[in-house]
Amino acid sequence: MQEITPITLNAPLVLLTGAAGWLGGRVAAALTTGLPDAGLLANGSFRVRALVPKGEDISELRKQGMEIATGDLREMQSVRAFVAGAEGAVLIHMAGIIHPKNVAQFEAINTQGTINLVTAAQKAGVRRAVVMSSNSPVGFNPHSDHRFTEESPYDPHAGYGRSKMLMERALRAEVAAGSTMEIVIVRAPWFYGPNQPSRQTLFFKMVKEGKFPIIGSGRNRRSMGYTDNLAQGILLAAVHERAAGDIFWLADETPYTMNEIIEVVGMVLHEDFGMTVKPNPFRLPDIVGGAATILDATLQYAGIYHQKIHVLSEMNKTIACDITKARKVLGYAPKIALREGMQRSVDWCVKNGQSF
């Protein structure tokens, strides 16, 4: 258990979207019960109201004492109902879509849905909005030693990156126009941690079976964010005075090579959980990643999204960021590194019936 770091929220109400999701669920826990294993707890006399889509499992949110509003970011009526009576509140917007049924959903949800929410929140008198973005608006690093900063130019990769770029531009335009609501953008890369979706468990399974494809040398680097580290940064962005109107990268302390990520997952499975991990013979030439990138772009241009092709297109790319600004301005201090974070992730899978 980590030493507890309380973060005080001076607001009567916290509005939270994406609370039933992977990362949003950890933010929800930090706001309510706290995350003692990560040393994280939000202090203050505030209520938490979550916006969840129809059909989501809200049992855990109920246990945490949250107010529940059911609705869709694309429907202004439900968005207005969610922010009703929210004067002086803090909004933490985590909802979005990464792997859609079709490409059109990217902008409908990530871009227009966010604009709908921010517009309604401003009119309701919300004091500050913290909005989750991604590494995707800036694309891929030019080489493995390069790190993105908050000043890196936009160069989005495919539909998801474009939707997040358009979202960020709309938010920055609000800030430039003198928005009465403070707006903070936080960017997170590939994240990992408890409550993971099946796609992350499949990653573990492929590593265990020696079937995860390494494209190229495997020396390309990826920033990753353990979910509780990211939750810390999100709460700091919600409270720090100097965060208003700014953008921050949040991630683990340092990027990892793909070789290192796969090696650590294999070590955790074998050494910590006694699983047999097969050697990985799947090393494919860089041209496979290039071909996947072209195919992904072609399909998305036609409005088609294929998750496995899209993910494959990124596997030989460096996507790495510098968290110096978040450390200096927010006091962000990620406490959990790759080995411990992966151990906790696998432990959660084992305890929750996700088999490899």
Swiss-Prot record:
Q: What is this protein called?
A: Uncharacterized protein y4nL
Q: What does this protein do?
A: Putative nucleotide sugar epimerase/dehydrogenase.
Q: Which GO terms describe its cellular component?
A: cytoplasm
Q: Which family does it belong to?
A: Belongs to the NAD(P)-dependent epimerase/dehydratase family.
Q: Coiled-coil intervals in this record?
A: none
- Presence of the UniProt keyword Chaperone in the record: no
Task: Show the Pfam families listed in the entry.
Answer: Epimerase
Gene Ontology molecular functions: aldehyde dehydrogenase (NAD+) activity
Which species is the source of this protein?
Answer: Sinorhizobium fredii (strain NBRC 101917 / NGR234)
Cofactor(s), by name: NAD(+); NADP(+)
Keywords (A to Z) from UniProt: NAD, Plasmid
Q: Which InterPro entries match?
A: Epimerase_deHydtase, NAD(P)-bd_dom_sf, NAD(P)-dependent_oxidoreduct
